[in-house]
């Protein structure tokens, strides 16, 4: 087995709000991110990227109390997803940019993983549908 056999992997350390991007055995980049609030924790486990969207629409998650009465938000500066969405195999959870840079480094979301917009764009360009995503506590 060679380093290239290992492929691309994202590891998110939920409690320390860090996202690590590996290409093979090599750590390419580490990012500070925002993860879920205690009332809306980012799920732990092994997932994978299932969708990639440029300039996504934001839709209120069905059945979410916090989103009741909210309207969809089109792409643009007011969109809470920024310019990129990487949906993972956990309902309504993804990795995305955020216009709220002050939230980075904190537990501040409703379960998603927020990144600075430029960093989400960087990651988006390097991962594929099927890329593994491991979300661990520490």
Please describe what each predicted stretch is:
Residues 1-5, 37-40, 44, 57, ...:
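Exported/periplasmic cell-wall-interacting domains
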Residues 1-56:
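Cell wall/extracellular polymer interaction/catalysis modules
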């Amino acid at each position: 087995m060679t380093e290239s056999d290992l492929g691309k992997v994202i590891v998110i350390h939920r409690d320390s709000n860090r996202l690590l991007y590996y290409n093979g055995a090599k750590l390419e980049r580490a990012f500070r991110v925002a993860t879920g609030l205690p009332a809306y924790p980012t799920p732990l486990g092994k997932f994978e990227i299932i969708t990639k969207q440029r300039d996504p629409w934001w839709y209120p998650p069905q059945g979410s109390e916090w989103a009741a009465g909210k309207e969809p938000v089109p792409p643009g500066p007011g969109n809470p997803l920024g310019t990129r969405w990487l949906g993972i195999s956990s309902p309504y959870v993804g990795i995305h940019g955020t216009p709220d840079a002050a939230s980075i480094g904190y537990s501040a979301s409703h379960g998603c993983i927020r990144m600075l917009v430029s960093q989400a764009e960087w990651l988006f360009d390097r991962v594929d549908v099927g890329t593994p995503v491991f979300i661990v506590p520490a």
